[in-house]
Amino acid sequence: MPLYFERIEKMNKTIKNTVFSAMFLALCLVLPLITFGSTQIGNAISPMHIPVLICGFVCGWQYGAIVGLIAPFLRYLIFHMPPIYPIGTAMAFELAAYGILSGILYKIFPKKNKFIYPALIISMLGGRIVWGIVRYIMAGLGGSEFNISMFVAGAFTNAIPAIIFHIVIVPLVVMAFKKTGYLKD
């Protein structure tokens, strides 16, 4: 293939990734509206996490990181939710980690559908660990408390419905992208 066509191919992929990333960012803004402002429902399904995880799989770690980092702050500017400190700030780091990990793990794991699940689960664990570290640092800076039981409750116990929901939804969407041919094996 001549160099010109390789450049066009790369440019087309960059444009597609940018457009998809914009769509995923928009989904981060509007999906929480399905909770009707209920923080209990929002915490139960964590709707902002889904587009970021999918963005990492579909567009790559760089795009996933950017969408994850921007989404909580942009959502706060538009809807005044989530509260910017400490929730939104910790969430930005968590979502950026989701985007980075899902993108990197999808790239290095075999492209069989069954490997989407370990990539997703490891990404979710890594993002939650990042969230805990950031919350711990912010608590120390703010003179408040954040201990291991608060971490386990916030990252896992209270998040069980969201974890299950993400394990069901995210792989289905990633497999749909694969089926369309956008994600190459």
Spans of features found by a protein language model:
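Alpha-helical transmembrane segments and their cytosolic interface
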Residues: P2-L25, F109, N113, F146-D185
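Hydrophobic transmembrane alpha-helices
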Residues: P2-V58, Q62-Y63
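Hydrophobic alpha-helical transmembrane segments
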Residues: T18-M23, I50, I54, A65-L69, ...
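Interfacial aromatic-anchored transmembrane helix boundaries in multi-pass membrane proteins
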Residues: C28-I45, I70-L105, A139-L141
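Membrane-interface helix caps of multi-pass small-molecule transporters
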Residues: L33, I100, I104, I108, ...
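Mid-bilayer segments of alpha-helical transmembrane spans in multi-pass integral membrane proteins
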Residues: A96, I100, M124-I137, I163
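Internal alpha-helical transmembrane segments of multi-pass membrane proteins
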Residues: K107-I129, D185
